[in-house]
């Protein structure tokens, strides 16, 4: 049996490949280190620099003068070294000792530390109370303005309601409501206007001077109670409607039996010049 041949040792080749991988990885990540350092400098408003070694133990520093940075790394280090020890301690803190800063303190020191914490809490509480007061004051002012507006509206209503009550309690409304609808006196009080007149305050009596144009209507006479009495009597005799007596009071519950308006021969009862009651003529 032939002896087994030894395979070539590839450890040297593997080390070379690993070294090349590290170099390529460092080249890819180093620009990201510089970007993060510049962002930290901008956010904190302080000068930032770092020193690192590459895969070949070569030194890399940032920032450098060729990086268009206002301060190079050696300038930052010189500025830091120029600070006194007291100034450095003011801005230095050992994070490892921070949880144990109460250890080794005497009773008096602990009492002072607690008083300091209480004073800090009291200051925070006072600030919170001031903020709440300002908030409540602003809301109360808005509520006061709303209440004053509502009170003004209520006062205005109180001023209007007595006048409205006086108007609704006029004697002539009661007098008109007590009379029957068919009374001639009621028609005289309500007054009528001729449709088509420009002024609603003009009643039929204003058109008495124009009767000369109606030569065939001499039997109408003067518009008013007499005309309405004659019209009521004529309706009573023609259609036998309601009850008509000597005091000229008649019942108007015949609306369903009346013919349409356009069938009347009376020119004042046609659709063009029909007499219409005007609510504006009622003295309210």
From Swiss-Prot:
Keyword Repeat attached: no
Region annotation Disordered: where it falls in the sequence: 1-20
Record's keyword annotation contains Membrane: no
Subcellular location per the Swiss-Prot or TrEMBL entry: Nucleus
InterPro entries assigned: SRF-like_MADS-box, TF_MADSbox, TF_MADSbox_sf
Segments forming domain MADS-box: 21-66
Domain of life of the native organism: Eukaryota
One GO term describing the cellular component: nucleus
GO molecular function, one term: DNA-binding transcription factor activity
Keywords, comma-separated and alphabetical: DNA-binding, Nucleus, Transcription, Transcription regulation
GO biological process, one term: positive regulation of transcription by RNA polymerase II
Positions of disulphide bridges: none
Function: Probable transcription factor that may function in the maintenance of the proper function of the central cell in pollen tube attraction.
Assembly and interaction partners: Interacts with MEE14/CBP1.
Name the UniProt record assigns to this protein: Agamous-like MADS-box protein AGL49
């Amino acid at each position: 049996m032939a002896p087994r041949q030894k395979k070539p040792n590839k450890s040297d080749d593997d080390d070379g490949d690993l070294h090349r991988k590290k170099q390529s990885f460092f080249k890819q990540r180093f620009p990201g280190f510089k970007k993060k350092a510049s962002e930290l400098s901008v956010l904190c408003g302080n000068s930032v620099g770092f020193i690192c070694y590459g895969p070949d133990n070569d030194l890399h520093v940032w920032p450098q003068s060729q990086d268009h940075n206002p301060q190079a790394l050696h300038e930052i280090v010189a500025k830091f070294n120029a600070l006194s020890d007291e100034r450095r301690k003011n801005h230095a803190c050992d994070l490892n000792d921070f949880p144990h800063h109460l250890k080794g303190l005497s009773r008096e020191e602990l009492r002072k530390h607690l008083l300091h914490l209480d004073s800090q809490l009291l200051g925070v509480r006072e600030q919170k109370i001031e903020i709440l007061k300002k908030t409540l004051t602003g809301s109360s002012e808005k509520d006061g303005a709303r209440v004053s507006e509502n009170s003004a509206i209520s006062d205005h209503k109180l001023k209007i309601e007595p006048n409205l009550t006086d108007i609704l309690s006029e004697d002539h409304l009661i007098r008109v409501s007590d009379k029957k609808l068919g009374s001639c006196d009621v028609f005289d009080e309500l007054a009528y206007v001729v449709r088509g007149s420009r002024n609603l305050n003009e009643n039929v009596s204003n058109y008495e001077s124009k009767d000369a144009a109606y030569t065939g209507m001499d039997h109408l006479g003067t518009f008013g109670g007499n005309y309405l009495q004659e019209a009521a009597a004529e309706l009573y005799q023609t259609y036998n409607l309601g009850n008509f007596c000597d005091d000229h009071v008649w019942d108007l519950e015949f609306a369903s039996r009346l013919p349409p308006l356009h069938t009347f021969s009376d020119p004042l009862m046609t659709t063009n010049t029909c007499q219409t009651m005007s609510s504006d003529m009622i003295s309210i």
